[in-house]
């Protein structure tokens, strides 16, 4: 019996990132973590900065960083429209760690006119990138 799959199309503003049959998609929605499998109810939600994990038709996995965007689930397809998508191997771990430190330092010493929202977004994106890198390292160590 063939494994149940659903068509996934993942695009960013710059590129078409992934198109194919998947058994599962895990992504960070604004209301929490989502696990999407074939037969999932229709859904439209925002995506927050975080990791997206794809389990392909053959059982292999691929991990991405999404900076945010929109997730649409239909009976026969899933669409991810992301602002920025990076494959795990495209993430610069040192740059992400520096961005995290910059945002934390700026927030700690901020005055009344400081833009906390922008700093919080930068911090969330850096933390999400570092989590993707850490997940990949853990999977390699297994």
Swiss-Prot record:
Subcellular location: Cell inner membrane
NCBIfam families with a match to the protein in the record: ATP_synt_epsi, PRK00571.1-4
Gene3D superfamilies noted in UniProt: ATP synthase delta/epsilon subunit, C-terminal domain, F0F1 ATP synthase delta/epsilon subunit, N-terminal
One of the record's GO cellular component terms: proton-transporting ATP synthase complex
Descriptive protein name: ATP synthase epsilon chain
Gene giving rise to this polypeptide: atpC
Subunit structure: F-type ATPases have 2 components, CF(1) - the catalytic core - and CF(0) - the membrane proton channel. CF(1) has five subunits: alpha(3), beta(3), gamma(1), delta(1), epsilon(1). CF(0) has three main subunits: a, b and c.
Family as reported in the entry's similarity comment: Belongs to the ATPase epsilon chain family.
The species this protein was found in: Shewanella pealeana (strain ATCC 700345 / ANG-SQ1)
Lineage, opening ranks: Bacteria, Pseudomonadati, Pseudomonadota, Gammaproteobacteria, Alteromonadales
Pfam families found in the cross-reference section: ATP-synt_DE, ATP-synt_DE_N
